Each structure stands twice: as structure tokens, then as C-alpha cells.
Amino acid sequence: MSAVAVSPWAARRQRAGELRDRHPFAGELLTLYLVLLPVQEDAWHRARERPPLPEELPRWAAAGVLPAVIEATVAAGPAALAEAVRGCDAERALVGWLAGAELDPADRYLARATLGPVLEALGEEAGFACDRARGADQSQLCPCCRGLPQLSILAASGESLASGPRSLLCSRCSASWSCSRSVCPACGESREARLSVFAERFDGPVSANGGGDGERPPVFPHLRIAGCSTCSRYLIEVDMGRDARAVPEVDELAALPLDLYAADQGLTKPTPNLMGF
């Protein structure tokens, strides 16, 4: 592993603070996220400096990261989550998440909050700590750890009326990989009629292909729902050309109106984000 890595934590911290001030409806979740960030940053640095062996990762994280995650959650999280994490079989949750097992929301939150920064620090070696045989269609999974996609990201193209190429962000190790804009990232569906895109406006979500009052600016000009009626899955899609300051994994946490609208349409994400949405 290279000893040099660009730390993502300052940008995440700054963006979370900005979005918390801008979107009060996401304040509780972003407050918890801001309290978690120092814990995750410390885990990232320690894993970069002395990477744990893959077979030792659950025990390493349970001893050295998990207690601080629980402390931060009890201090700043919603009461129901704080109570739930106290009763979790934490190391079992960590093992299960690395294996791709279905976990209840509190276990999944603890595992992601604890292991996410460590796997991100391990980079290409993260896959050796994970079950890489997950899912029937391997082409839709992370090439590093075979985790599920969390976000769709459109790169800035340099042109005001066009977006750049698309990549997906892994929910497990934070790696990214290329994906065609004309397919569903969850199931590979390519028929245009089965793929839907919705953007958020002050008066409610509308089709990105038309509709709305045309007078009020979007609440999330750089975010939209990319959904599929074949598998009933969706991802939040971040257009970096519309907001170069966006930090995709942070901006997704503030996109609650989009998630609620998608749920009303019968859509679910391949996997919930860190905060369960």
C-alpha cells in the first residue's frame, strides 16, 4: 500500500457543516455524522499507518474503533439508535457486514460506521477482508470488494449543458468504478422506458424530463433520483458539474426529501446509507 493518500476528512467535515446549516431537516443526522467524523478519521489514519491483517480486521476494529463509535452515537444520535447500539452483538455485526449478510438497522449502522473508514484506508487490499462472492450479477458490484453501489456520480464535463462520465461509489469500501449512464446500476436494465430520473424542487419532486412550475430553483440542483422500474431500485445521483463543492457521500445524507419521494414510488436503494436511508 502506498504511504501517501489524500485525506478526505476535512472536506467531509466542512461539507457536513454547510449542509446542516442549509437544510435543517437533515440537522439531526448531520450532527451525528459530524461527531462520528473524528472517530472515523482516527481509524483511517491508524489503518493507513499499520494495516490490520484481513483475518484480524473484525477483532481489530471491535477493540480499537467500535467503542468510540458507540460513545459518539450515544452522545449525539437519536435516542432510539443510541439505545439500540447498546444492545448489539457488535463483533458479530462486523463479521456479518464483511460477509455481506443481511443485518438489522442498528447492527448495519455500527458495522458501517466502524469498518467503513478502515476499508477505505486499505484501498485495493480491502477486498481481501470481504466476502467477494456476493450477488448473482457480479458486473453490478464493486470490483474491489464486491460491495453494493451506494451512489451514482456524474463527473464535471467542463460544458454547462452536459454532464461527464458516470461512476458508482461502493457502500462497503468507498472504491469507485465506471458505469454506463444508460443502464440501471442495480440490475443492468438498459431499456430507456424502464429507467426514470426525478429531481427535487421546492414544490415537490418532478420528472427531470419536464414538469414543475419552472419558477422556483431546485432545492438540490445537483442531486436526483436515478430509478429503475424493473428492479424497483434507485440511487441518489450527484452531478459534480452542477456543484463542484459537493462531497457525494455527505450530500446523500442531506437528500432526505429525495429518499422519501423514492419510497413513495415504491423504490428502495440497493443498500441504505450510513444513516439508514
Show the residue positions of the predicted features.
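Cys/His-clustered metal-coordination modules, chiefly Zn-binding fingers
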Residues: 123-263
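C-terminal membrane-proximal segments flanking the terminal transmembrane helix
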Residues: 258-274
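N-terminal alpha-helical interaction blocks
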Residues: 1-132
